UniProtKB/Swiss-Prot annotation:
The keyword Thylakoid does not apply. This is Vasopressin-neurophysin 2-copeptin. It is found in: Secreted. SUPFAM superfamilies: Neurophysin II (SSF49606). Glycans are attached at residue 112. GO terms for biological process: vasoconstriction. Disulfide bonds join 1-6, 22-66, 25-39, 33-56, 40-46, 73-85, 79-97, 86-91. The record marks 9 as: Important for agonist activity on V1aR/AVPR1A. SMART domains: NH (SM00003). Pfam families: Hormone_4 (PF00220), Hormone_5 (PF00184). Interacts with vasopressin receptors V1bR/AVPR1B (Ki=85 pM), V1aR/AVPR1A (Ki=0.6 nM) and V2R/AVPR2 (Ki=4.9 nM). Interacts with oxytocin receptor (OXTR) (Ki=110 nM). The modification Glycine amide is found at residue 9. Keywords: Amidation, Cleavage on pair of basic residues, Disulfide bond, Glycoprotein, Hormone, Secreted, Vasoactive, Vasoconstrictor.
Length: 144
């Protein structure tokens, strides 16, 4: 089970030293489960509710508690990927999780960045810009 959702007095009563890493998940088993539908990998980011996270449902049936991530963050979460904090239910952008994942990028490293080159990358960049942009003001009548 995931440490955050284990029953009190049962698995959750065990000390932190008895926690194991949650199941591996994602492409090539590079990630770790953070919740029943959340799989995060340092170099790939987090997959929420996707096929990459399906294996994470198995964790609910395992008898011993697990915990992924190193540094605590947010509301009962742990740093899961560069700038991302996850608990067993959701993930949020968390600046304090950025420093933990700084590593040099090598030419042979595979990451989502290379998969988003071209039109897909341009679309994602535009969506991110729109999400961070202030609400547009209505145009004045007749003034274009």
């Amino acid at each position: 089970c995931y440490f955050q959702n284990c029953p009190r007095g049962g698995k959750r009563a065990l000390s932190d030293t008895e926690l194991r890493q949650c199941l591996p998940c994602g492409p090539g088993g590079q990630g770790r489960c953070f919740g029943p539908s959340i799989c995060c990998a340092d170099a790939l980011g987090c997959f929420v509710g996707t096929a990459e996270a399906l294996r994470c449902q198995e964790e609910n049936y395992l008898p011993s508690p697990c915990q992924s991530g190193q540094k605590p963050c947010g509301s009962g979460g742990r740093c899961a990927a560069n700038g991302v904090c996850c608990n067993d239910e959701s993930c949020v952008i968390e600046p304090e999780c950025r420093e933990e994942f700084h590593r040099p990028v090598r030419a042979g490293d595979r990451s989502n960045v290379t998969q988003l080159d071209g039109p897909a990358g341009a679309l994602l960049l535009r969506l991110m810009q729109l999400a961070g942009a202030p609400e547009p003001q209505p145009a004045a009548p007749g003034g274009y």
